[in-house]
Amino acid sequence: MADKITREEKTIATLDLVLRVVVDAGNWDVFSKRLVRYTREQYGIELPEDIGDLPDTSEVSKVLLSHLGEDKAVLSAYRIAELTQPSEMDRAKVTEGGLAVLNASRDESEAQNPSNPEPESIESDAVEDLGVAAESDPSDDEPDPEPEYDHREADHDSDADSGYYSADGGRPGTPVDEEPQDDSPSSEETASTVIEEAQTSASNDSHDDDTHRDDGSASEEDLERDALVAPADPFPNLRKCFERQAMMLTGALKDAADTADPPETLSVDSVQRQLERFVFNPDRRVPAEHLEVRYNFYPPFLTPKAIASYHIFAVTASIPLSCKANRSGSDLLAKAKESTFFKRLPKWRLGIEIDDGLGTEVTAVTELEEAKMVPLKDDVSRLQWAKMRGEHIRFFSYPSLHMPPKISRMLMETLLQPFADENQKAEEALPCLSDEEVLAIVDPTGRLHGEDALKAVEKRRAAVTMAVRYTATLELMERVFREPSMVKKMQEVLHHTFHHGFVALVRETAKVNLSNYATFHGLTYNNPLNNCIMSKLLEGADKEDYVVDSIYLFLVLTWQTAMGMWQQAIDDMTIQMYTEVFTKNKYRLYSLPNPTAIGKAIVDILMDYDRLTEEMRKALPNFTCQSQITAFRHFLLERSNIPAVAAPFMPSDFVPLAYKQSPPLLWDQVYLLQLAFYLTKHGGYLWEAPEEEANNPSNRTYCPCNLCSPHRMPGHNAALHNEILAIGTFEIRSPDGKTFKLTPELWTNAYLDKFDAEDFHPFTVFHYPENASRFASTLKACVTQSPEILSLIRQIQESREEFLLTKGKGVYKDPNTGETISRQPRDTARAQHAGDGQALPAPGAYTTGGNRAETAPAGAVRLAPDYQDGQFPIAKVGPHYHGPKNVRREDQGYRGGPGGVRGEREVVLSRRAGGRRFGRRNTRQSGYNERANRYFGRGGGGSVRGQQGEHPTTSPSASEPPAPSRILARGTPPSPERRDRQEE
């Protein structure tokens, strides 16, 4: 590459390239006027009016750069140049033969009038992608496909500019033989023929020959109209996508030219790396309006390296036979599943015996000597199938959990031995402390000699090495995770991840799904494509394995995020300061007796005791959705050459369950797996309701963990239950005009903040159902802390309902069920003028007769009976009314069918069909019986007239159906004798 140039020179070169293209196209005057107007309207910046009169394009570039700045100048020039260039549809009007002739004539003219050639730059490709024709090198063999803009016609009302093309690729009505032949007499003649044919076709289609010009050139007014009436583009979205991608590449390559030192060669890898950096780590100086479009153009489901700085690394190691998948049915696995307390790290010592074999606790089905995944007698179906298809698996890519590489290298070079220089292979680096210095630390009195002294020195070096490589990382893990606030935050995040407990209750109450939100480095994202109920679709061992593996991967992501944050915060000055501190303290570290003490001392120095650890806890963990964990699981299996579709393994299947059964390289994996088992039990994610209560709706959101029970569960907290019932049912107004209303949003915010530290047990599994007597805190609501307020509100609501049901007029329905809870009004006026719209009741109707209420709700699932003053409603017959209208009970069925929705539809149809018959009933007087009508709801013709005659003898008490339950209790209907006395 050429010498590095400044950013300003790069911008001027880009602008000059665009301006030269405009000059060559002959549109400079239009371009300059549009550019001045565009900058005035878009940015409020006045450019010099004489900018189009400047002699050189480089001078114009400098003026644009000084007035607009780098980004605005380039974007404005690109946009105006694109508007003044021929569109894709106009380019398509000229056939391939005409294009070749035009290109030949252009090359000939360029040979006669050579211009100053521009050196090839990375911007030229980007400008061509934007649709702006860049200067072509005369030595290029490929012709330029863009026609001269001066030859395009000005008629935009014809089909030539409409963007419509026939199925064979040409315009409708254009003969195929119009295409010029290759044996044309001359280039100029053929070019004019092509242009004339295009103009003739356009004029014939639009019947407007006055708009064509003989010289084939476009005036300034035509160009102005081109911008206002643009031809339809058959692929506008694709073209816009290419333009925006070209803008991204231009910006990325400009940044590369400014930041790369030394300059990188132009290759696919370098462009991809710079594009990822430009997309996911944008420059803060870039205007905000150009940032959001970047994320639309990264390949879907492709893991970007720029933001996965730590998560993509893995440690490929041999799978131990003692892994979790080979411990089915063992006591060790059963104890891990029943973990009831947060274990502390063991006391590390040298000479630990590691037994990572299959052991005698499990029974193998086959005798495969080389297989790592051994089929066992007690394997679940998932492992049976996976091991059968995964006999070839020997290694697994365990996710990387080590400290930041800069820290690890500094510790090794400061406390153990500097790395050898590759250029000086003959010289071996000396250890940080010589044998004499270590012996003086181990045996200050000088009692050890010979081999004993050498063994003591080697033992102390081994202890320091073990602490640097293994135990320091484990000690740091324990400090980050084993803290009450961290356990609380992890359980809250996992409740969101699995849509469990209080998160599910929020969705039931406020209709808000909080499980789709994810956070990363302080930014919140919404993932509506997430499936938050994946864990609830499994049962038994499959659900347990899935939940444990998901929590294990969540802990891995959390730890990797913490180490990535630390890695980004480390610079050369920090490493230098760490080196100085460890150099001063290396004698003290070597004087400590065991790896546990040495590891704690190293972490004390690195974390400044707990200051840096506290900062990590503040930023972690991130809210994680199940789709992220699923993608991470698939990524790890894919890195290990394990096709999940054939062998359904999980990453936690390859991790041992105990430190003594694991090689030291996997001790950090063992720690996170043990913590995953504990969090699974502590969070109650595997809780299931008893069989006799499986259908209880309250069990869908129940969780026994300390975060939920008893304070956040309405089944235990009566005050919370009453508050949930009062949401949106009242509004309180103060004398000064302020109002208070318990809305779902207000309740949700208070509910999420509800937490009682006294009843939270972070390091032990202490669930409320088994230990209810040991929870002493008062159970309160979220918003209204006084239960008397809720009781008063409930009483007011009940008294209001009582008043409406007894004294009010109209139809009152339950807002939740649609059930009619009041007596329906009688429309006596309509009964007096009943005509063809009325009908006899259905033959199978209520035996006391009468029609069903016309205003009965059509969508009610259950219907309530009508009472009035403790009695069944009795029809009041007017002087001209023969047959009751509203006496029928709403819960009565029809013709062998139950009451409800179906009965209502049938009665409407019967009224329409029997309207004439009802009109005939109004003229009959002989069948009228006043007492029968009062007590039995009958008219001249009964409801069962075809079966029992006009006056059935069935008593009303024998045909009364049982009354369904009501919201408010009512009195018992009196007997017929008592009603007789009341009437008399």
Curated annotation (Swiss-Prot):
GO biological process: intracellular transport of viral protein in host cell; symbiont-mediated suppression of host gene expression; symbiont-mediated suppression of host translation initiation; viral translational shunt
Cell location: Host cytoplasm
Principal place of residence: host cell
Positions of the UniProt region annotated as Disordered: 131-231, 810-853, 876-984
Annotated region (Binding to host EIF4G), positions in chain: 411-476
Further remarks about this protein from its record: All late proteins expressed from the major late promoter are produced by alternative splicing and alternative polyadenylation of the same gene giving rise to non-overlapping ORFs. A leader sequence is present in the N-terminus of all these mRNAs and is recognized by the viral shutoff protein to provide expression although conventional translation via ribosome scanning from the cap has been shut off in the host cell.
Protein name: Shutoff protein
Lineage summary: Viruses, Varidnaviria, Bamfordvirae, Preplasmiviricota, Tectiliviricetes
Gene designation per UniProt: L4
